[in-house]
Every structure is written in C-alpha cells, then in structure tokens.
C-alpha cells in the first residue's frame, strides 16, 4: 500500500474543511453587518425575539428618616414604578416628605424650597405624583411625557411634563424634566446619581437635584431662576440586591429669591441633615 494516495486524500479533506470554515466566517460577517444596519425592532423580528412581553418594577430609591439636629424630623421618599413592554411603558414617579415637630416654616420646606400654610405643623410637605408615558429612543435613553400633580399645604398645582432620562457617559443616571402648569407657570428639574461599588455589597451613591422656576411664587416660598440645589451621599449595604439599608448626609442650598423668602420666614438659605433608610425594589 502506497502512502501518497492517503496523504493526498488527507490534504484534500483539509482544504475542503478550510474552505467551509471561510464560507461560514463570511456568512457570519454578512449577518453581523446586516444586523448592525437593522433597527431594534427589525433585529428582534429577525432573531425571533418576543418584544411584546409585559413586565414591571417598583423601586423606592429613597425611603428614609432625616434629622437636622433641631426639634423637627422628617420622613422622605423618592419612588418610581413602571409597567409595559420593551418600547412603551406607563411610568409613575412620586416624591415628598412628612414633617413632624414645630420648626420654622422655611426649614419645613421640601427640596424645591416650597412651604405651605401651617408649615410648622406635622403633615405632608409638597409631595407630587407624576404619571408618564415612557418611550425608548435609544439603548440608553427614554423620552417621557405626561402630567404631575402636587400635594400638600397651600394651593396644589397641576403640571404638564416632558423629559428625558437614561444613562449618561460613565454610567451616570441622569434625568431632566420641564413643566408647565395650568396657570402658565414653568419649571425644570435636573437629577443625577451614580453607584460606586466599594465591594460587591457596599455601594456609595452620590446624588444631586436642582430645581428651576420661570417666575416667583411667594405663596410656596419659591423665587424665579435657580431655586435650590440638593446634594447628598448615601452608603448602602445590599443584604440582597432588592433590599439595602443605608445611611447618608443631605445638604440643601437655596438661591436668589428662594433664599430671600426663606430668610424672611425666619429660616436659613441652607440645611444639613443626616439620613437613614432603606432602598427596596420588587
């Protein structure tokens, strides 16, 4: 038996396998290029992915007690929830405070610098609820539109809301919303936060929120322009991802007319509070 035919046969098989591998690679490159040019919906259809499934989530990002070192304390919350599909969702947000004790009116104001009648009494201070339609416009950003209703002492207000939220570069969560009220008033709110993982369970979260108003509203202790800036840092321990106690510090600075109105009411242009609470979601 001569070895040459066997070697030739092996070489022929190797060449066939190499050609087949090249063809598979070319097909994969073509598919990848086609998918890169597809829209998200076309890609989902091509890959036979079901993008009509409905799902939801509720998160209390801040559910805490704050103490500024005086006779008054306050419970505060910042929560949101959504339900819908991959592209469109119903999105609900709420935030506010429940004040106890008898500190002065200006110190009983919320992060927007607002105070209502009887602000020295216990009760809800300037809570609000937003009901929004959420639409995905990119892998990182959503556009939102809907309405906001304010609650608490004094005259309540109804606002139309349009905004955008998502992940900015370096994984900062960012949110910007503009409002117009049924009385022609305008406002804007900017928020940003970032999760810095110290360990797999210990997370440091810086947070910032700024509120701006188109015109003064003395009844709610609001001046025009930049009304206030809240900056806080919270350190949480994730017992589970969905359950994390935390401690933190919250600093609020009022500006311009809002600071003047706070001083006129006997308060300060800034507050510094310690916070302890829970971050939960389900």
What kind of region is each of these model predictions?
Residues 54-56, 73-77, 125-129, 156-160, ...:
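Residues that define the transmembrane beta-barrel architecture of outer-membrane proteins
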Residues 87-92, 139-143, 170-174, 199-204, ...:
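Repeated loop/turn-to-beta-strand initiation elements of outer-membrane beta-barrel proteins
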Residues 62-64, 92-96, 145-149, 176-180, ...:
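Transmembrane beta-barrel strands of outer-membrane/channel proteins
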Residues 156-218:
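Detector for outer-membrane/organellar transmembrane beta-barrel domains
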Residues 24-106, 113, 117-122, 127-135:
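Outer-membrane beta-barrel initiation region
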Residues 233-238, 268-282:
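Outer-membrane beta-barrel "beta-signal"
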